[in-house]
Structure formats: structure tokens, C-alpha cells
């Protein structure tokens, strides 16, 4: 059986990475999974969330934000800000991105820093969450390498790499 886009059932979408897509970010990539396109960026900033200070938690923090731009789908998708709240799907996906990256980053090596990951979907043609996780991992390691070069980190806090794919049978 062949899919609409011509792939066989056991064939992944083509995966592409265009690095340094956002020059002011510490790490950034435009990731493509087939026709899906997501800009993933990583920024390190001083300070940690208040809850970490109040609970005397050592190390840093990593958090993610995920958004589908209005023109990313065939039918315009309203921005979360215009509705006054994050939609449930976006909230679930950004938590998944954060958890996936926290699983492979040694937060203690960040020191008192917060690592912000932003994933902005330019085109949604399936696999936005998997593209976001994979692209975010690339952007995070790029940010770490920049901080190592600038002597702001001794070594990369990335202990493993994270990548994601999804598969379905129908």
C-alpha cells in the first residue's frame, strides 16, 4: 500500500535541518519532516523559576513553548493570545517537548540558568510534535556549543540525544 505522498508504509518522511535560522537565538534550526516545517530555537538566560529557589532545587531549568502559526494549516488557526488561553493540544505538546528534553539534559550542569525552547510551526502537514522534539534537540545542543565556545559552560549538559517519529497503521 502506498500513501498519498507516495511513501511506502515503512518509509519515514524526508528529514531536513537548516541551521542558524534565527541569528539572535543561541541555537536555532528550521526542521522539515516531509512538508511539515518548524522553527526551533533555544535561548539560555540567567535565573531559574521562583519555585526552584523556594524549594532550594540545585541547577537550572528547561521549559518549552509550542505554537502553530495562523497560516500553518489550510484553515487559519487563531493565535492562542487572541483566545486568551493556550489550547489543550498546544499545551500538551509543549509539555511533551519540555519533558523529552529534560530527560536528556543534565540540569545541574546549567547552573542557575533557564533554557527556553521555542517551537513555531510554519507548516503543519503531520508530525509537528515529533519534528519539534527533534529540532529542539538540535537547537539546544547548538546553544550549548556556543556557550562552551564562549567559556560560559565547561561541557555540554546534553547527556543523550532525543529524536522522535510517530507511526500509525490504517
Question: Whereabouts are the PLM-identified features?
Answer:
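Short, structured patches in soluble enzyme cores that scaffold and shape functional sites
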Residues: 19, 35, 68, 119-121, ...
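Compositionally biased, non-globular sequence tracts
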Residues: 2-7, 81, 153-154
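Short alpha-helical basic/polar micro-motif
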Residues: 28-29, 134
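Conserved mixed alpha/beta catalytic, RNA-binding, or beta-rich assembly cores of soluble enzyme
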Residues: 95, 116-146
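Broad gene-expression machinery/nucleic-acid interaction feature
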Residues: 12-16, 26-28, 35-39, 59-63, ...
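A structural signal for small-residue-enriched, beta-sheet-centric alpha/beta enzyme cores
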Residues: 88, 108-112, 127-131, 141, ...
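Glycine-rich, flexible beta-strand/loop modules in the N-terminal catalytic cores of phosphate-handling
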Residues: 21, 29-110
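Short, Gly/Pro- and small/polar-rich lid/capping loops
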Residues: 1-25
